[in-house]
Amino acid sequence: MFRKAIFFFLMFCTFSLQSQNLQLHFDPRSSIHGKESFQSDYMTATFEMFKPDQWGSTFMFVDIDFNLSKGNAGMIYAEFSRKFNINDFPLMPLIEYNGGLGVFEVDDNDVGGGYSIPNAYLVGISYPFQLGNVFMDTYVAYKYNAFKETSHDVQWTVIWTGNFASDKLTVCGFADLWTENKSQMNANSEKKVIFLSEPQVWYNATSNFSLGSEVKISSNFIQNSEVYICPTLAVKWNF
């Protein structure tokens, strides 16, 4: 019975994402929070791919932020995860990789240098379930943050997706809560707790084209302990 539930969960996710999609978001965070917090508003392109198979499922996404002058790309970030079925066992082992690269500009809009978003490697256990029309997944994982001085941490994630109004409305997103060292240079640094959530709402104009919004909610995430709420305007193409 549980394998049947897993099957329908995977099939639902496949239908919702139609294997893969491309999103384009306008992020007005500088207009909302001011240039003291964010230098500019910018566009973000997101590619998502979900692929289930008889052994489990693979999910990945890639974000590209066009946050440099003249709309040039300034950062790329990616996550890849794999979950595994174990017969009728209700939990699914999970592995995940996160990481990225970026560049920054100096005052004359020339590229001033580059930076790396430190790799993170996760190993944990996932539990998929259903609440009404909403299919959900939650996992707890050990997180290895590859800072200059390694940070050993834990992450809890909740993921949701559901269709309503005869599939014209899709609600989806995730919420992450994790720990990491306050200082990436000190292995004995105190820990901080970070929260990040990105709920999305989509109006599905056709089976391929959607209009919607994502609200980026973060606490203790962007170089300080402040809470930021950054809504976007977005379009999505499923293919």
Each predicted region: which residue ranges?
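Outer-membrane pore/translocation modules
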Residues: 21-27, 37-41, 71-159, 188-189, ...
